[in-house]
Each structure stands twice: as C-alpha cells, then as structure tokens.
Amino acid sequence: MDQFPSLVMRAHAAARQAGFPLTREEAGPDRPSACLPGVGRFLAVLAAGCGGGRIGELGTGAGIGAGWIASAMPADCALITVEIDEPLARAARELLTADSRVEVITGDALRVIPGRGPFDLLFADSGVRDPADFAVLVSLLRIGGRIVMDDVTPEHGLPPDASLRADDIKRSFFTGEPRLTWTEVVLPDLRNSLLVGTRTT
C-alpha cells in the first residue's frame, strides 16, 4: 500500500477545502476531527484481513478513515459508514461513489449500525460517550471481530483529575469489558492513542 493512498489524499484535500479539522487540537473539545495518519494505517492493516467480512464506521467525517479502510480491504469486503451531518455525508458519498463495496449512510450511527451487523471490524469515530452504547457496539461484533476507538489521550498525557476526561471513559470501558481482549496503541506523536479490542466471548 502507498504511504497515502490516492483516495485518502483526495479526502484530505476535500477536508481542507471544507474547513474540517484535521487534528484534535484544531477541532477543540466539542467538534469532530479527521482520522490521523497513524490511525488510518492501523485501520488499513485490520481491514486488509477482513476478507468476506463487514466493516462498520461510526462517524464518516470527511471520509479520510473510510478512505484508508476502502483502500486496503479485500474485494469481497463491505464497508458501511454512517455520518449524521448531511453535508459531510454528501461529500463523503461523492468521494466514495465509485466503490460499490462502500455504503455511506446519513443518520445517527448508533441507530443505524445495530441493524447492519454483525461486524468483523468496527471503527467508533463519532462522539460515542455512554458506556451502554460501547457495550452495544461490542455485541455487534462477531467472535474474533475487532473494535477500534481513537481520539484518546495517552495516560501519561492525562491531567491529574483524569476522571473528568471524556476519552478516559473509553479506557475505563475497555478495562472493564469482559468480552474484549484489548490494548492501547500510542501514536508516534505521543499525544494521541487508540484502543483496540478483539471480542473473545
């Protein structure tokens, strides 16, 4: 795979043109941001192993994460990506329209995704914050399926009162979820990490 697949490059260009934040720092605490390159490459590695499977993405955004996934997944794999913001969903649909394996849906991902499983890979890139919703997502995985959540601050970067950090809710859920074997992957910038878990039961 190229360092940056052409589909990802086009998604980046569209994001810049639309003013969509490319980093969490640009976005601030209450806005979504684009899929970082380190996260995208990680997703590509997982997607490449989903032959004959189904991948779900909660929060299409500018389509960068979907671009990484679609560029790597096998020909017999399907990607369902859901975005609640109509202009973003429309732009991503235009970007991905040539790939019949990809379906871009406008709507609330937590309402749409449960009806489309089971999944071999789920990328929860939207503002999922409720542990009950996290548990639902795990239930949508096949045994052996994987879930990835990004926009997490590494533990060494958390403030003293870490209980107030929204991303620590994700880490706490993964820690206490008995159906997952999981780990945290710190990205090269040392300011961002992602959580990845495999459903075992």
Question: Which residue stretches match the model-derived regions?
Answer:
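A short alpha-helical cap/connector motif
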Residues: M1-L121, V128-R146, V152-T201
